[in-house]
Amino acid sequence: TVAGKPVLRKHLTIVLTSDHGGSGTGHADATVREHYRVPFLTWGDGVDAEDLYALNPTYKKPRRKRPGYGAARQPVRNGDVANLALSLLGLRAIPGSTIGTDQDLVLTADAGG
């Protein structure tokens, strides 16, 4: 396992998420949490064992709501994954992307990513 290999563990960050669920024949009902609530987990050397929203106060924890894309403060979204991964690799955001382009999602209280 990764945990048993110190050299690998020191250079690896895992970012895990999934697609949202659905029920019946759709998945757009904003009143059904399973239509929009998904896991977004990170693990690795330098990743704090902390809630992403505690580390990223500029993001809005949605709680039981589903904020629209036009809201002033956004929740962490699946769309943040690609630009977070690129940031971890020291690369710029995907050209033309609209989510996470500032690459300001941090995984540590040091804000060093």
Identify what each model region corresponds to:
Residues 1-11, 20-113:
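Membrane-interface soluble catalytic domains
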Residues 15-17:
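Generic enzyme active-site microenvironment
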